């Protein structure tokens, strides 16, 4: 079991010295392998957008200092988030665009920047053609799947509380949209697992070890 810790954009209005101190303490835990979810959410706007940007920028800087990858929650804000990442600089440890549900035109500049992307149950939905088209185009080395638990259960389990075991349905749909069959299908499953392990099942960083 590994840990991701970060201040979600919904709660960005609470960013301040005390919150940063608590986050840094969590990141020093050697089980922590990622800083996230962080980013921008313009759909709900539960925190003012200026607070979202302030917290986002601060946490990207901390991730770079700590040598950890970032996991990004971006909703209806991909252009602004991309501009911020370009301005702050991409963490060398990597970047994961969490639970992508948009089209290839939105995703392409993130892929070009080297960001990995995860697809959840929405990949299986009837109205998910644009998501499937995007998933078919992503280079294999940048692909992952996830659950977004407890939300977004994939077909045929829509309406249930999502759980990690359900990722197999999303992974199967991913193989389908990429036309992978037989050994190619198994190789894709192995690659998706390897991508996740290499990014998230990482040894402690020098920063975490106090070096």
Segments and roles (model prediction):
Residues 34, 70, 95, 143-145:
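Residue-level marker for buried hydrophobic side chains located in beta-strands
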Residues 31, 65, 87-93, 113, ...:
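Short helix-capping segments at alpha-helix termini
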Residues 16, 23-24, 74-89, 96-97, ...:
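Distinct, well-ordered alpha-helical segments
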Residues 1-69, 113-116, 121-126:
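Active-site gating/metal-coordination segments in enzymes
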Residues 10-12, 41-43, 75-82, 101-108, ...:
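Active-site environment of divalent metal-dependent phosphoester hydrolases
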Residues 62, 167-211:
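Mid-to-C-terminal alpha-helical segments outside catalytic/metal-binding sites
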Residues 141-163:
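Short acidic/histidine-rich active-site segments
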Residues 3, 37, 63, 98, ...:
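Conserved, mostly hydrophobic/aromatic
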């Amino acid at each position: 079991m590994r840990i991701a810790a970060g201040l979600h954009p919904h709660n960005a209005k609470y960013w301040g010295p005390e919150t940063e101190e608590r986050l840094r303490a969590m990141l020093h835990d050697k089980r922590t392998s990622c800083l996230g979810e962080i980013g921008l959410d313009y759909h709900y706007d539960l925190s003012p957008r200026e607070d979202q940007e302030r917290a986002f920028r601060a946490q990207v800087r901390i991730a770079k200092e700590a040598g950890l990858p970032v996991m990004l929650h971006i909703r209806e804000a991909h252009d602004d988030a991309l501009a911020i990442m370009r301005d702050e600089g991409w963490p060398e440890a990597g970047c994961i665009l969490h639970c992508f549900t948009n089209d290839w035109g939105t995703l392409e500049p993130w892929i070009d920047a080297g960001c990995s992307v995860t697809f959840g149950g929405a990949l299986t939905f009837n109205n998910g053609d644009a998501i499937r088209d995007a998933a078919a185009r992503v280079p294999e080395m940048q692909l992952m799947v996830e659950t977004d638990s407890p939300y977004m259960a994939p077909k045929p389990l829509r309406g249930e509380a999502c759980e990690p075991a359900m990722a197999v349905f999303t992974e199967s749909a991913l193989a389908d949209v990429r036309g992978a069959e037989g050994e190619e299908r198994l190789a894709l499953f192995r690659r998706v697992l390897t991508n996740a392990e290499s990014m998230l099942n990482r040894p402690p960083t020098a920063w975490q070890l106090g070096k």
